[in-house]
Amino acid sequence: MKLSDIADNAGSRKKRMRVGRGIGSGKGKTAGRGGKGQTARSGVRIKGFEGGQMPLHRRLPKRGFNNIFRLDFAEINLDRLQEAVDAKTIDGSGVINAETLVASGVLRRAKDGVRLLGRGELKAKLTIEVHGATKTAIEAVEKAGGTVKILAPAKKDEGEAA
């Protein structure tokens, strides 16, 4: 067998239909688009139109709302804090707050504040200032000999909320 003998199986590759190329092709004149009107034009479709039937997005009820005063906290778990202390990216002797976490690269951004979550185990004695913490996280920090100070969350500006 030579390289020139290799070929596709018969019928495995089909040529595309060239539409609008005369009546004899079977796809001439309207090119398979039916008669005139909106659907015969290019690029024009009514999204969600179901032929006059009430569309699904109008049959379903509206639910909920977007709270403009909602605060979005950056979350950090105890195991992530312990990893950072072990890797010496965070100085465990000082106060750990949103600024130190962002500066050390543990958090990408502080958002509207930092919330401490209780996953994992903390061995280091840390002084932590956060905007929120779970009960299990506070208990774990205090068990390790540290303290947690809950700060008031920063309020959003009037311009951002609207």
Curated annotation (Swiss-Prot):
Keyword presence, RNA-binding: yes
Protein's GO biological process: translation
Biased composition (Gly residues): 21-37
CC annotations in GO: cytosolic large ribosomal subunit
Top-rank lineage group of the source organism: Bacteria
Entry GO MF terms: rRNA binding; structural constituent of ribosome
Keyword Lipoprotein found: no
Region (Disordered): 1-41
PROSITE patterns: RIBOSOMAL_L15 (PS00475)
Database matches in InterPro entries: Ribosomal_uL15, Ribosomal_uL15/eL18, Ribosomal_uL15/eL18_sf, Ribosomal_uL15_bac-type, Ribosomal_uL15_CS
Keyword terms, alphabetized: Ribonucleoprotein, Ribosomal protein, RNA-binding, rRNA-binding
Gene3D superfamilies (alphabetical): 3.100.10.10
Subunit structure: Part of the 50S ribosomal subunit.
Job of this protein: Binds to the 23S rRNA.
Family indicated by similarity: Belongs to the universal ribosomal protein uL15 family.
Protein name: Large ribosomal subunit protein uL15
The species this protein was found in: Rhodopseudomonas palustris (strain BisB18)
